[in-house]
Amino acid sequence: MIQTQSMLDVADNSGARRVMCIKVLGGSHRRYAGIGDIIKVTVKEAIPRGKVKKGQVMTAVVVRTRHGVRRADGSIIRFDGNAAVLLNTKQEPIGTRIFGPVTRELRTEKFMKIVSLAPEVL
């Protein structure tokens, strides 16, 4: 469950290391975002010579949460940390690599590129 002011790790090689959620998109007063939801983030920590700089406002999709995701069979998949992948204006990933596992819930038409780049799909 990601909300405003939540800090997330970045699971791609876009150049950002840590981002902070500044808005949960999809609804006028939506409070929480889960896996597969799109959020607005600001870059809090970035590596030198990366594609993004500190202070930039970007869109991102949540790929891992500590809260986890519940499956239809009753199982819950939880992760050790919260992570997101940065997107461009066309909702495509900025980075060319994805680090760490992602869940099967991202297998929609919008995020097939992220699923194909991920080393492991749970």
From Swiss-Prot:
Q: Which Pfam families match?
A: Ribosomal_L14 (PF00238)
Single GO term (MF): large ribosomal subunit rRNA binding
The record's Gene Ontology biological-process terms are: translation
Keyword field: Ribonucleoprotein, Ribosomal protein, RNA-binding, rRNA-binding
This entry carries the following GO cellular component terms, namely:
cytosolic large ribosomal subunit
**Keyword Oxidoreductase included in the entry's annotation:** no
PROSITE patterns tied to this protein: RIBOSOMAL_L14
Tell whether Ribosomal protein is among the UniProt keywords.
yes
NCBIfam families listed in its UniProt record: rplN_bact
Q: How does it assemble?
A: Part of the 50S ribosomal subunit. Forms a cluster with proteins L3 and L19. In the 70S ribosome, L14 and L19 interact and together make contacts with the 16S rRNA in bridges B5 and B8.
Q: What does this protein do?
A: Binds to 23S rRNA. Forms part of two intersubunit bridges in the 70S ribosome.
| Family membership | Belongs to the universal ribosomal protein uL14 family.
Q: What is this protein called?
A: Large ribosomal subunit protein uL14
What is the gene called? rplN
